[in-house]
Swiss-Prot record:
Record keyword Oxidoreductase present: no
Entry function: Catalyzes the reversible isomerization-deamination of glucosamine 6-phosphate (GlcN6P) to form fructose 6-phosphate (Fru6P) and ammonium ion.
E.C. number: 3.5.99.6
Pathway terms, separated by semicolons: Amino-sugar metabolism; N-acetylneuraminate degradation; D-fructose 6-phosphate from N-acetylneuraminate: step 5/5
Originating species: Listeria monocytogenes serovar 1/2a (strain ATCC BAA-679 / EGD-e)
Name of protein: Glucosamine-6-phosphate deaminase
Gene coding for it: nagB
One MF annotation (Gene Ontology) recorded for this entry: identical protein binding
GO CC aspect terms: cytoplasm
Keywords assigned by UniProt, alphabetized: Carbohydrate metabolism, Hydrolase
Amino acid sequence: MQLITTENKLAGSKKALEIIEKGITSGEVNTLGLATGSTPETLYAELVKSDVDTKNVTTTNLDEYVGLAASDPNSYHYYMNDLLFSKKAFKESFLPNGEATDAEAECARYEEILSEHPIDIQVLGIGTNGHIGFNEPGTSFDSITHKVVLTDSTREANKRFFEREEDVPTHAYSMGIKSIMNAKKIILLAFGENKAQAIKETIKGPVDVNCPASVLQNHPDVTVILDNEAASLL
């Protein structure tokens, strides 16, 4: 596990972009795994400005809310199109289908996509409770793509994106922890003091399902990029 501490979110995002650019330019990155939320927004803005050619790169995403159409401004389809896909050309882009009514079939469909497009670099954020994707504390390390019940803390963290608290979805489709760990390389991004405790448990704590991100200690190629605040408890 390589640890990089930077001055701020912009510097950390640029460091992550360097790794991604190098992988794409060398031809080592054919599939790029992407995350959503506030953490990677600056990375995507920098990627849009970058000269790196992504037309032969396929993308996959970690998760999507259950019940939201791709056209819904709160869906992750919309988020990705707004911040990245409408501004940068990729070969193909895959996300779980939030409108799928057969959860088992949708999860199997997405796992098939992941098997056809093995992830070369997976970008991750981390929740204040240590979740990666929507894999909440207690999720099995053997989990593959699944339908998850969102915890109160996760819904609370995401309610700022919705007009009303009751509009925040209660479920999501998420790549499982095993699905994430199958990526050849992982870049974990964390910025801000509110992520410091989760980062401490991820890097220094025991590998335990109560902090899902702690499983990254078992991955052979992880780069953790932090700002000074997120690194403050290390």
